[in-house]
């Protein structure tokens, strides 16, 4: 079916808005311009709203298979679509883990059956995410692994990481790491700083993260591997990534919205909806993350969408699982706090959430161009509303942003030329 998205505002390379029409057919963009018309096409009225590429999230947790009480591929992908995402990469901490061809085929089948957008599964670096027996990179790549990670835990043995990096390098695959030295966690539930002492809660020191990044960038250099750092949260980690890039090591990094928006002193009480890993750090860490994003040390923004049940998150931090949801609030929160205030341009934010993320894994998504996949969203930058976790499409309600007021909401999401989310009238 031919379609035309009519009367929308699209950013050009200079960051200027131009009124265009966008034609689509067979899941691809066929024309972009002010005078685009297509005979016998379905017309989607853009009403002068901003059009952007569908967002790309390289770090998400969909929980299926194995933990469907927290989230499913259906609910998670629908939540992502509502937030403006059309491509998401699903981490392998499921049950079973995508550590074999059989398990990868199972997950691919579930995705094909339930996903409303593009879901690209990770393969695990080690069997059962144990950090011990390495997986077969070549086999898992052949069955659709977008990259390789044991996210949720850090790989403790340098030899395991090094050997798997060498194997990944042979097959031009990216190794993606949750960096955490288990010997430095100390059963912590939040950042080791001022606030954990005030709340009398065990803390996780910054060095727990940064020491493993420092190790891994040197391993990546020796292995000739491409290496991506998940959810950078400390100034020391930023320094390690910046130094590695300066040395020519093939490293990329992401930052999460919550680490840009919040710091440890914002935590109001012993509330598990404020518990995530890595934890909210100090104000100086947050400032360092901002600077790193602006200077290119950090490449993109990723949500680390991590849903849990209300029962799991209803009490204090000790004993509760780490993680918060992020799909449905990421763009409006960042737009309100940084674009509206003039700290970022709209183009910067959109790029960090789309094309810059796609480039990490050489994905051909996150752009609006003739021949590209017809993945796009409409954003109403004037729309303001209060975040209400009870209204989330995700099964997860675990967010520290409940009750925040934000502007700039995605109101329509198109994936491969089909509307997969539209705001109710």
Swiss-Prot record:
Task: Name the cofactor(s) required for activity, per the record.
Answer: Zn(2+)
Q: How is the cofactor bound?
A: Binds 2 Zn(2+) ions per subunit.
Q: Name one GO molecular function term.
A: dihydroorotase activity
Q: Some GO term, biological process aspect, for this entry: which one?
A: 'de novo' UMP biosynthetic process
Annotated residues that bind substrate are located at: 61-63, 93, 277, 308, 322-323
Cite the binding residues for Zn(2+) 2. Answer: 151, 178, 231
Kindly report, in one word, the top-level EC class recorded for this enzyme.
hydrolase
Query: Which residues of this protein are catalytic?
Result: 304
Say if the entry is tagged with keyword Metal-binding: yes
Q: Name one GO cellular component term.
A: cytoplasm
UniProtKB keywords: Hydrolase, Metal-binding, Pyrimidine biosynthesis, Zinc
* Cited InterPro entries: Amidohydro-rel, DHOase, DHOase/Allantoinase_Hydrolase, Dihydroorotase_CS, Metal-dep_hydrolase_composite, Metal_Hydrolase
- Catalysed reaction, written as an equation: (S)-dihydroorotate + H2O = N-carbamoyl-L-aspartate + H(+)
Query: What PROSITE patterns does the record tag this protein with?
Result: DIHYDROOROTASE_2
Specify whether Hydrolase is a keyword of the entry.
yes
User: EC number(s)?
Assistant: 3.5.2.3
Give the binding site residues for Zn(2+) 1.
59, 61, 151, 304
Recorded superkingdom: Bacteria
Q: In which pathway does it act?
A: Pyrimidine metabolism; UMP biosynthesis via de novo pathway; (S)-dihydroorotate from bicarbonate: step 3/3
Q: What does this protein do?
A: Catalyzes the reversible cyclization of carbamoyl aspartate to dihydroorotate.
Protein family (similarity comment): Belongs to the metallo-dependent hydrolases superfamily. DHOase family. Class I DHOase subfamily.
The protein's matches in NCBIfam families, at most eight in alphabetical order, are given as:
PRK09357.1-2 (NF006837), pyrC_multi (TIGR00857)
Q: Which protein is depicted?
A: Dihydroorotase
């Amino acid at each position: 079916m031919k379609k035309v998205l009519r009367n929308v505002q699209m950013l050009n390379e200079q960051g200027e808005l131009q009124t265009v029409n966008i034609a689509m057919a067979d899941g691809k963009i066929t024309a972009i311009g002010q005078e685009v018309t297509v005979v016998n096409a379905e017309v989607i009225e853009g009403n002068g709203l901003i059009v952007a590429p569908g967002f790309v999230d390289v770090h998400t947790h969909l929980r299926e298979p194995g933990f469907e009480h927290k989230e499913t591929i259906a609910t998670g992908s629908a939540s992502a679509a509502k937030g403006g995402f059309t491509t998401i990469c699903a981490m392998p901490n499921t049950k079973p883990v995508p550590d074999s061809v059989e398990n990868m085929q199972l997950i691919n089948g579930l995705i094909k059956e339930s996903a409303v957008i593009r879901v690209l599964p990770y393969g695990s670096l080690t069997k059962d995410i144990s950090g011990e027996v390495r997986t077969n990179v070549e086999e898992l790549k052949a069955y659709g692994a977008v990259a390789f990670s044991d996210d949720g835990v850090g790989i403790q043995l340098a030899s395991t990481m090094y050997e798997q990096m060498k194997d990944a390098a042979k097959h031009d695959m990216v190794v993606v790491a949750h960096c955490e030295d288990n010997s430095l966690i100390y059963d912590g539930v939040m950042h080791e700083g001022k606030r954990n002492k005030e709340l009398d809660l065990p803390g996780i020191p910054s060095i727990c993260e940064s020491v493993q990044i420092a190790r891994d960038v040197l391993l990546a250099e020796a292995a000739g591997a491409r290496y991506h750092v998940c959810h950078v949260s400390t100034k020391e980690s930023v320094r390690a990534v910046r130094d590695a890039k300066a040395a020519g090591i093939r490293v990329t990094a992401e930052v999460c919205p919550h680490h840009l928006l919040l710091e440890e002193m914002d935590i109001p009480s012993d509330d598990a909806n404020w518990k995530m890993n890595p934890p909210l750090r100090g104000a100086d860490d947050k400032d360092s993350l901002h600077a790193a994003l602006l200077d290119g040390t950090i490449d993109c923004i990723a949500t680390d969408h991590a849903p849990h049940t209300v029962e799991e998150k209803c009490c204090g931090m000790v004993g509760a699982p780490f993680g918060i949801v992020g799909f449905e609030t990421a763009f409006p929160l960042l737009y309100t706090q940084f674009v509206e205030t003039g700290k970022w341009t709209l183009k910067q934010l959109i790029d960090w959430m789309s094309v810059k993320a796609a480039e990490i894994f050489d994905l051909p998504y996150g752009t609006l161009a003739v021949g590209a996949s017809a993945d796009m969203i409409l954003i109403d930058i004037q729309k303001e509303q209060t975040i209400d976790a009870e209204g989330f499409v995700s099964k997860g309600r675990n967010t520290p942003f409940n009750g925040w007021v934000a502007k700039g909401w995605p109101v329509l999401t198109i994936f491969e030329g089909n509307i997969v989310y539209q705001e109710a009238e």
